[in-house]
Amino acid sequence: MGVYLSTPKTEKLSEDGENDKLKFGLSSMQGWRATMEDAHSALLDIDNDTSFFGVFDGHGGRVVAKFCAKYLHREVLRSEAYSAGDLGNAAHKAFFRMDEMMRGQRGWRELQALGDKINQISGMIEGLIWSPRGSDSNDQHDDWAFEEGPHSDFAGPTCGSTACVAIVRNSQLVVANAGDSRCVISRNGQAYNLSRDHKPELEAERERILKAGGYIQMGRVNGTINLSRAIGDIEFKQNKFLSPDKQMLTANPDINTVELCDDDDFLVLACDGIWDCMSSQQLVDFIHEHINTESSLSAVCERVLDRCLAPSTLGGEGCDNMTMILVQFKKPISQNKNVSPAEQSAADKQPTGDTHWSEIHVTEESSS
């Protein structure tokens, strides 16, 4: 089977949800691709005050994206930093934890189980939402103990995935990103990027890649992968003299924190199958055009997917898997400003970054 199908799979997996602070809609579609390698998480209430959303764009295979969709939010919850109110640090640790968990006999077994489940059912299962209601994903008692077995020396998967997640607690928004999936917020109709696309040609990324012994060819690390950060891809993380954040390819996420206000309209998380076809502002404008006329937020997402789908595979753009989550904030947001002293202290410790989204007040935790 080639990279593309003869006709696109346009069936969509969509869902909507709502609580007293926000509502969301999402949709995913395989499109022209021969396999569906996107995955996502949408959890309205991982605790009484906190929602979690994530998109994961797999490459070289699909199991790492599925693994992240199933386990990343669990590791956020399990973190001591999370208990202390430091959502950014909790997310930061969880990204690295994904690589650790996918090693050894236990990691091999979990990846095999996800792969078997995927292979036995149609490709649309790739968009499955892992939630406390639909799986055991809220079980925090598994300490991921070491297992003996024939795959005890398994170093990790050769395939990988981007990860872009948004954690909303009251009026605090924390975005963690590794790769080229993207998170965008609409404030008074203006699009602001809350993540940066990690590409090898970026100066800081290029410097790290070269120092780790890698090279860049045709915009790809070692001529292979067109991302500079991702979860998985163990073959690019083999320098034993370097820490995980210094490897030529790293899971190290950018962490950005935003104080939400009543000017904030909605939040979008999407894989590059969307961003290759529309700029951040174009997508925000498109959503504003349809959000008040469609019956649900997922219907808006479906419109976006249809808008991006190419009529043929000749042009390249519009031929990728597509996944999008749309989160709309309920007003007034100001009434949600119930931040504990521990949470405020954690946020205050994050330095303000000099970034391309600086017109909106963002605190950025350095990941270089």
From Swiss-Prot:
GO terms for biological process, alphabetical: signal transduction
UniProt KW keywords: Hydrolase, Magnesium, Manganese, Metal-binding, Protein phosphatase
Co-factor(s): Mg(2+); Mn(2+)
Binding-site list for Mn(2+) 2: 57, 272, 320
Region feature Disordered, mapped onto this chain: 336-368
Stretches that traverse the bilayer: none
Family per record: Belongs to the PP2C family.
Name of this chain's protein: Probable protein phosphatase 2C 58
Organism: Oryza sativa subsp. japonica
